[in-house]
């Protein structure tokens, strides 16, 4: 059976990082229109203890998901009575500030403290303002920060990065805007510890800790694990519709059920805003790269109890690769309804297409010719025929209902319906080409299909008392079903082309009738529980577990897993207010892909493993700067590896066989993200890892053992305060892979040397509402 050049087959072009020059100049027009009247946002429940006023304001701003700007030293010695009950944002600030001599006033990006004028004292003036709680909420947009406030990817508990006993990397909205990160591939290239492997122009795979990442979440709802060979929009999603991207490292079986051991990617959508705001972006860059974006958000009723947001983006670009181009329209809408002071309903949807021309297939050129010699072509070489195109699309509708149950308990129901489809007419020069006379044969295939997925998740969370202390509990359950239907066509008739003068001219074959059919359905149900036990003021224990039922049916052999228990254990000990140490253990399993079969054509047992992690975490400046260091081990069973002894027989067997192997990943990583000084944002990370099989031989060597990623921006002061400058570097060590050379009848090592990539950016604030941004990517033109 033919598949669209499965990336785990015998031939493939190793690409572990982009090696091209890209220069993008973007002009952003941002307009934030103030409303004539103050919007009264629906009240929500708060329980903030009495204490220092600055601390209370930070906690309130975090829970209300708003910014508060003030000078910390001005509040020294002032106390707050605390806050308990249901309050609108303004009312909550008023209650906390009662008797302090200050009031909170609405500004464009949140709230600012203003001294109350009295007849006897005249006007009190604050010194220079300082953002203290902007980044501490559950959104990153508008905070200007490179670090998040809270995350819930690992356990459903809303925790700060320091309180989460696993490594988490978050690329915020500000980071994406500063460096022009417009799709998931771009974001992953900036994420510490992640390797991006591009199979061709439309298909990418991501790796973490030695494992492919096939766990995607959208607003915390797991999506069906994607089949990398049949990419259908996941990695090309436009970032215009997302607030941030969270990457939780290691196993995440507690919430995902079945999945991979490397990491989980959670894309968090933008939300409507309480005040009207909008922005338009126009961009132009190298190789006719043009982009436009419009984003409008705000209240839709006088009372503000209905809010909406609409986003549209369109990108039309060519490439350094010959003849390649891609058009990408994206539309997104979301609405929030305050059904009552205690109930919030959210509904939305998105519509995305990627429409390429001259899509490359299985790399951009064949590695070897018919003599087994390595090909040398110009960097812009594209192995695709002009008619080759891997079109992808995504259609999504979603809904969420949240209800305050009282006494700090909240119930939440999330529903998601998604269609990921592809329509691929593929033709490219592959294998051991060209022949000695310069001719080559074009490999062709047509693949069409879609995956229709439905997911539902329901949980309740809240505090409970035990042993004189307050603890947290989450109880939930989820159900999902996805049906993948696809057809494959191919024509094996010779289609000879001129390799040495290749311009993409080739005849499209007559596809005829479908020669392969896919009709597989995956169903998964699960129930989960998580608790955060407050054993002491400085010691927290997280316990959790999930019971999983997993079933695959269709025209491939069925598979069922019932009552599988997936545990989660984590502990955090606070050394002081800044530093904490942690340890965690997580578990996960993943049924094998249908092509992972042994010599007898039997499907391999599910891939499964355990993740151990120990580390140190810290937060500084009221959480505006986060740092972590971790050591991790992943012990894997039933890893699918090529059965080379069988596959390399003469004559070559008709089926390609895999065998099960054990593997262990060991490594460590450090990361820093956030504001290291006023106006100076940073995200930086270093990762080292080694993967060995049960014979102590290194595997997954196409992933670099070491990598560094660092991106930073600084807003200048004084007369240059309209200017922001920044830049970034990516470095990775050598990567290599043994690939079978058919003409030489043996394996040969293909490698990519260690390299640095350097990017620069600058932004100039022309007026209050107009800015211009320049991004220079790969300034030293590494290839």
Place the predicted regions along the sequence by residue.
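Structural signature of Gram-negative outer-membrane beta-barrels, strongest in the C-terminal barrel
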Residues: 336-340, 451, 470-474, 478-482, ...
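C-terminal beta-signal and adjacent terminal beta-strands/loops
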Residues: 731-740, 763-783
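Outer-membrane beta-barrel translocator/receptor signature
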Residues: 224-225, 241-243, 254-333, 339-343, ...
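Acidic, small-polar-rich N-terminal luminal/periplasmic segments of exported/outer-membrane proteins
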Residues: 62-63, 67, 76, 82-84, ...
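Gram-negative outer-membrane beta-barrel transporters
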Residues: 536-537, 658-740
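Membrane-embedded beta-barrel scaffold of Gram-negative outer-membrane proteins
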Residues: 402-406, 410-416, 420-426, 606-675, ...
């Amino acid at each position: 059976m033919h598949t669209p050049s499965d990336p785990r087959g015998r031939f493939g072009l190793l690409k572990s990082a982009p090696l091209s020059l890209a220069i993008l100049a973007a002009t952003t027009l941002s307009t934030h229109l103030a409303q004539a009247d103050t919007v009264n946002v629906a009240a929500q429940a708060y329980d903030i203890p009495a204490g220092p006023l600055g601390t209370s304001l930070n906690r309130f701003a975090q829970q209300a998901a708003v910014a508060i700007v003030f000078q910390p030293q001005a509040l020294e010695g002032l106390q707050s009575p605390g806050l308990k009950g249901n309050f609108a944002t303004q009312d909550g600030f008023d209650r906390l500030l009662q008797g302090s001599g200050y009031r909170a006033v609405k500004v464009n990006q949140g709230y600012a403290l203003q001294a109350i004028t009295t007849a006897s004292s005249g006007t009190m003036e604050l010194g220079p303002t300082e953002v203290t709680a902007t980044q501490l909420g559950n959104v990153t947009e508008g905070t200007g920060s490179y670090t998040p406030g809270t995350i819930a990817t690992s356990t459903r508990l809303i925790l700060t990065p320091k309180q989460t006993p696993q490594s988490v990397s978050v690329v915020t909205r500000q980071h994406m805007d500063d460096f022009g990160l417009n799709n998931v591939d771009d974001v992953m290239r900036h994420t510490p510890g992640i390797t991006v492997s591009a199979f061709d122009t439309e298909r990418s795979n991501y790796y973490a800790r030695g494992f492919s990442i096939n766990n995607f979440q959208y607003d915390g709802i797991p999506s069906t694990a994607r089949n990398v060979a049949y990419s259908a929009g996941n990695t090309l999603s436009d970032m215009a519709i997302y607030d941030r991207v969270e990457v939780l490292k290691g196993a995440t079986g507690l919430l995902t059920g079945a999945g991979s051991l490397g990491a989980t990617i959670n894309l968090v959508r933008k939300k409507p805003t309480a005040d009207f705001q909008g922005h338009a972006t126009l961009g132009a860059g190298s190789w006719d790269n043009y982009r436009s974006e419009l984003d409008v958000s705000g209240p839709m009723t006088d009372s503000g109890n209905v809010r909406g947001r609409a986003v549209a983006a369109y990108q039309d670009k060519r490439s350094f690769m010959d003849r390649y181009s891609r058009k990408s329209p994206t539309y997104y809408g979301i609405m929030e309804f305050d059904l009552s002071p205690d109930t919030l309903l959210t509904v939305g949807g998105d519509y995305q297409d990627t429409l390429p021309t001259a899509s490359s297939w299985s790399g951009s050129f064949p590695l070897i010719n018919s003599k087994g010699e390595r090909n040398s072509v110009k960097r812009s070489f594209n192995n695709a025929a002009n008619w080759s195109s891997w079109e992808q699309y995504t259609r999504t509708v979603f809904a969420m209902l949240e209800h305050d149950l009282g006494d700090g308990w909240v119930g939440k129901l999330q529903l998601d319906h998604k269609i990921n489809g592809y329509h691929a007419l593929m033709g490219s020069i592959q294998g051991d080409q060209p022949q000695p006379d310069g001719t080559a044969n074009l490999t062709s295939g047509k693949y069409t299909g879609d995956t229709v997925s439905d997911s539902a998740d329901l949980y309740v969370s809240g505090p409970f008392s035990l042993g004189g202390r307050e603890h947290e509990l989450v109880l939930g359950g989820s159900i999902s079903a996805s049906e993948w239907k696809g057809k494959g066509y191919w024509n094996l008739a010779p289609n000879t082309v001129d390799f040495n003068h290749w311009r993409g001219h080739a005849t499209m074959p007559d596809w005829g009738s479908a020669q392969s059919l896919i009709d597989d359905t995956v169903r998964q149900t699960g129930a989960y529980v998580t608790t955060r036990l407050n054993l002491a003021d400085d010691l927290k224990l997280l316990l959790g577990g999930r019971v999983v039922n997993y079933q695959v049916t269709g025209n491939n052999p069925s598979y069922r897993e019932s009552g599988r228990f997936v545990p989660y254990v984590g502990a955090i000990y606070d050394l002081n207010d800044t530093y904490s140490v942690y340890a965690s253990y997580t578990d996960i399993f993943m049924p094998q892909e249908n092509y992972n079969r042994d010599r007898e054509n039997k499907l391999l047992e599910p891939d499964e493993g355990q993740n151990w992690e120990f580390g140190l975490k810290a937060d500084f400046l009221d959480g505006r700067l986060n740092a972590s260091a971790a050591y991790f081990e992943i012990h894997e069973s039933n890893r699918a590896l090529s059965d080379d002894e069988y596959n390399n027989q003469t004559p070559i067997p008709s089926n390609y066989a895999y065998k099960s192997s054990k593997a262990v990943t060991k490594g460590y990583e450090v990361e820093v993200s956030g504001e290291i000084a006023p106006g100076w944002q940073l995200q930086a990370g270093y990762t080292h890892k080694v993967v060995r099989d049960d014979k102590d031989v290194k595997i997954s060597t196409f992933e670099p053992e070491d990598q560094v990623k660092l991106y930073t921006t600084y807003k200048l002061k004084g007369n240059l305060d309209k200017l922001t400058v920044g830049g970034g570097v990516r470095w990775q060590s050598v990567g290599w892979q043994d690939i079978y050379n058919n003409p030489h009848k043996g394996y040969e090592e293909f490698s990519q040397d260690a390299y640095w990539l350097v990017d620069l950016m600058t932004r100039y604030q022309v007026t209050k509402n107009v800015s211009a941004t320049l991004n220079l990517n790969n300034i030293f033109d590494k290839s």
